[in-house]
Design a protein with these regions (language model features):
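Membrane-embedded beta-strand positions in outer-membrane beta-barrel channels/transporters
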Residues: 99-101, 145, 297-301, 345
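Bacterial Sec-pathway N-terminal export signals of envelope proteins
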Residues: 21-65, 180-182, 215-260, 269, ...
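Amphipathic alpha-helical coiled-coil segments
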Residues: 41-56, 133, 137-156, 192, ...
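Periplasmic alpha-helical coiled-coil/stalk elements that build and connect Gram-negative outer-membrane
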Residues: 23, 27, 51, 133-248, ...
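Transmembrane beta-barrel architecture of outer-membrane proteins
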Residues: 95-97, 143, 188, 271, ...
């Protein structure tokens, strides 16, 4: 029972170690996004949007203002007639006033609602731009990940080549012992072994550099023993045009322009509101009474500013011009991304063919070596010919 338990826990530990040493493309992408400092921008953008929406909504709250003035005027209000034996006092030419006013918006022509929509649209543009930047990060992680996978395949082929050269070296050494080969033949094999080892050192150095950069992106310690799992076909980089974040970024900019255009109409609308004024000054509401008095006034106010009509036409033209720039940018992006996708597809096809050809070359070289060994043993081929025939061209 104790032995079974020990084996069970050992198996679990071994499985955990193997799982820890393996890394998928999705995990690398997720860790890179979580570890990248730019990810903090998402929270900051959301906070900024919340602040702006809150500020816009406060436009419905009562607005308080305090004002004061001291003036001297050239004339004052007088009665147009004189009444005998009656001295009618008039206000002084120097006048003073301190006023507190409270305004309450009843209808602002849709200005607050428009500002909220503009805030949301602008925030969405920032978020989509953030997605574009994060996608660029994902693309860099993908390049490192697939670069390491390619190096792993090249290292495997290098190992097979070293094994083949090792067998050739042993065979030539046996031929020397039997007197049918010379040391120069063995040296030729040794030179190719050294070349293969040097190439392996270059591959391993490049792999360590790629792995170090991938570790920096993901924030995860990656050793040279870390195994990267090949993704399935559906896990590869998605080249579907509709899923690119750049397109959503262009769409968000278009929506922002739509909200800006709608905001132009709100500037043409009248404003209605309530107001209450409380003041203290000389004169008060009674202009014929030359003394300081307190007074108040309440009512409904309507204002209508037609000044925006002067610039309305140019403002709309400017928005249309910006919209055309966005559409041009979208077309340029789609053109470039199609070229890039075509180039990447061609590169992948070429790489796969080269790797398949390398595997076939190694297989054929093994067949040639075995056939040459048989000919040497049968006396139909010299050891020198065997050496030249079995040595690869690197």
């Amino acid at each position: 029972m104790d032995m079974k338990r020990t084996v069970f826990f050992f198996t679990l530990s071994l499985a955990a170690m193997l799982a820890h040493a393996q890394l998928t493309l999705e995990e690398c992408q997720r860790r890179a996004q979580d570890n990248y400092p730019l990810v903090r921008q998402y929270g900051l953008i959301e906070k900024a949007r919340g602040y702006d929406l809150s500020n816009a909504g406060k436009g419905y709250l009562p607005q308080f203002s305090l004002s004061g003035k001291a003036t001297y005027q050239s004339d004052i209000t007088r009665l147009p007639v004189e009444i005998p034996n009656l001295d009618i006092k008039t206000a002084s030419k120097d006048q003073y006033q301190v006023m507190l006013e409270v305004q309450q918006t009843l209808w602002d022509g849709g200005d607050i609602r428009s500002r909220k929509r503009l805030t949301c649209a602008a925030s969405e543009v920032e978020l989509e731009k953030q997605h574009v930047d994060m996608y660029a990060l994902t693309d860099r992680v993908n390049q490192l990940f697939f670069g390491i996978l390619l190096l792993d395949e090249q290292l495997k082929q290098n190992s097979l080549l070293q094994e083949d050269l090792g067998r050739t070296h042993k065979q030539v050494a046996d031929y020397i012992a039997n007197g049918i080969a010379t040391l120069s033949d063995l040296d030729a094999v040794s030179v190719e072994q050294l070349n293969t080892r040097q190439h392996r050192v270059e591959l391993e150095t490049t792999r360590r550099a790629y792995l170090s950069m991938l570790a920096a992106f993901t924030g995860k310690d990656l050793s040279s023993e870390t195994v990267l799992l090949k993704p399935a076909a559906e896990e590869n980089i998605d080249r579907q045009m509709n899923n690119r974040p750049e397109l959503r970024w262009y769409d968000a900019q278009g929506e922002q322009l739509h909200q800006q255009e709608a905001a132009l109409n709100t500037r043409l609308m009248p404003r209605f509101g309530l107001f209450v004024q409380g003041a203290y000054g000389n004169p008060g509401l009674n202009m014929l009474k030359d003394e300081f008095n307190a007074y108040y006034m309440a009512g409904v106010r309507m204002s209508w500013n037609f000044g925006s009509l002067y610039t309305l036409k140019n403002d709309r033209r400017r928005i249309d011009n910006t919209r055309q720039q966005i559409e041009t940018g979208r077309d340029v992006f789609l053109f470039n991304i199609r070229l890039q996708a075509t180039q990447q597809d061609a590169g992948i096809v070429s790489m796969r063919r080269q790797m398949a050809d390398d595997d076939e070359i190694i297989r054929l070289r093994g067949n040639i070596r075995r056939a040459a060994e048989a000919k040497v043993q049968n006396g139909t081929m010299t050891a020198v010919s065997y050496t030249h025939l079995t040595l690869p061209t690197i």
